[in-house]
Amino acid sequence: MIDDNKVDDALEYLRTNASKAAQARAHKVYVEEFRKTVKAQQMALRLNLPVNAQEREAYASEEYQKHLLAIKDAVYQDELNRWGMVAATSLIEAWRTQNANSRSQGKMQ
C-alpha cells in the first residue's frame, strides 16, 4: 500500500518544483537556440574562408565546444526535473488506482 504521506510528499514536490522545472526547460531551449548564434559568431570571425571552412572552424572552436557543455548541463537539469515530476505523478496515479481498487473490493463484499 502506498502511504498517504508519500502522496502528500509527491504533491508537495510537484507544487514546489514547478517553477524550477519551467526555468530548467526555458534555459534548455535558450541554450539550444543560442548554439546557432555561437556558430554564426564563430563563422563571422573567418570571413576570409569559404563557407564550408567557416562552418568547420566554427564547430571546432573553443567557444562552440564550451557551449556544447552548457547544452549538456541544461539538458541534464531539464531531464532531472522532468523525471522527478514523472515519478511524483506516477506515485499519485498508483495511489489513485490502489484506492479505487480498494473501494470496489469494499462494495463487492
Task: List where the protein language model places each region.
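Extended alpha-helical coiled-coil "stalk/arm" regions
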Residues: 28-56
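Short, glycine/alanine-rich amphipathic alpha-helical segment
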Residues: 47-76
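Long amphipathic alpha-helical coiled-coil segments
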Residues: 25-28, 32, 36-37, 69-102
